[in-house]
Amino acid sequence: MPVSRRQLLAGASGAAAATWLNGCGGFSRSGSSGASTSRDTVTFMTWASDAEASAFTRLASAFESANSGVTVDLRIVPFGEMFTGVDAQLQSGTAPDVFRVDYPTMGLYSSQGQLLDLTDHLDSALTDDFIPALYQGVQFDGAPYGVPHQTDTTCIVYQPAMFEAAGITSVPDSLDSAWSWEEFSAVADQLKARLGGDVLPFAYDWQQAGAFRWLTWLFETGGRLLESDLTSPAIVSAEGAKALEFTRSFFENEWIPNNTSVKGATYPDTIFVSQKIAMAFVGDFLLPGLDEGIKDRFEWQATYQPKDVRASTDLGGNALVATEQASNKDLAAEFLRFMVASENMASSCEEAVELPTLQSLVGEQLDYATRPDLVPTFAEQSTTMTAEDVAQITTPFFGQINILLQEQLEQCFVNGQSVEDTLSGIAEGVEAAAGG
């Protein structure tokens, strides 16, 4: 299915890249000393779904084939171990040459002198092709410290049979027709009343490190986490209170399972497959796993996130970065360019069901391996993320804010902390993080 240029670029951005499959030259085999055991080896550390792991393995092999004598040491680790491992290795001087990092965490590394400045390694033909807001997300003080590798976003998957049983006959088929918060509430109430038993209306994907996805609701009210200086808190506002009160009502109205709270260990895709919820907010990268889990047991479709004064979504996806410790910096940078070359990015996105970050690929006929009929919904939803949203989520101290959101939202949703105290707690934490 084609992903239109208008859809993916309209929100995020306000030449084609060089293709490296047929031979990657220009790097030196005599790079500086560092963590790798060989200057002809690229160590690449990442987490990965099964589909992503397959794509990474295939592309690593292709890079080796294109560069005689070069080895890619691909190290796939669980997401929960990824950044504690990277941090320990950076401290000990044994960091991988290249690693994967999500956009909200990017600023933590780019601001600390731990990553390779890619200014002299990326030409304008490539950098001009990146979706501007995503390229902005990998920069610090105007310099690029990574390459946007892919992006993903959240939409709602739902079970038509459950909707039919609850008497819900109309589902949004465009961003313009997306449910308002009031309409979404009515749908949730109807599902709760009609389905009965142990089936609940939905679950949201804000668990653990996904706590930042709560900001979607804040942005939809027209609110902000940070002022325009990107350091001062802006969340103590009528918009902040509205977003917090609405999302707290998910628990008060028993629309979502309690074990899917922000610090919960149960994720929406898991219980959607088990048919314990009618709807699940999920990222497009989960479509292969959902399809494998559901098989032909029931029909499932996708629709858009609800909206308030505006539509919004989360900044999903990941960048690839090279470390300052890389044993051969030129080779590490060449590997990054290879991974985001147009043909390679396209094949990776197709296999893992993710969205490209190159403008030249937006609108191309990407042959998605799983549920290509649903991908355009996610692509259109991704256009609702603005450059201002991205700027607030990619500050150097956002990693601390994400932990803060986990704590404060859990206190509000589960432990009875007031909306006012929660907003104040987030604001105080933002001030501490920005000042630290």
PLM segments and residue spans:
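Hinge/lid segment of periplasmic solute-binding proteins
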Residues: 103-155, 217, 299-303, 367-373, ...
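Long, aromatic- and glycine/proline-rich binding clefts that accommodate carbohydrate-like moieties
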Residues: 296, 300-303, 350-403
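Glycine-centered hinge/linker elements that transmit conformational signals in sensory
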Residues: 187-189, 229-261, 305
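Extracytoplasmic/periplasmic solute-binding protein
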Residues: 27, 143-149, 154, 180-233, ...
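Short, solvent-exposed loop/beta-turn-alpha elements that line the ligand-binding surface or hinge
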Residues: 119-130, 173-177, 200-204, 223-242, ...
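Extracytoplasmic/periplasmic substrate-recognition and gating elements
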Residues: 61, 65-66, 166, 252-255, ...
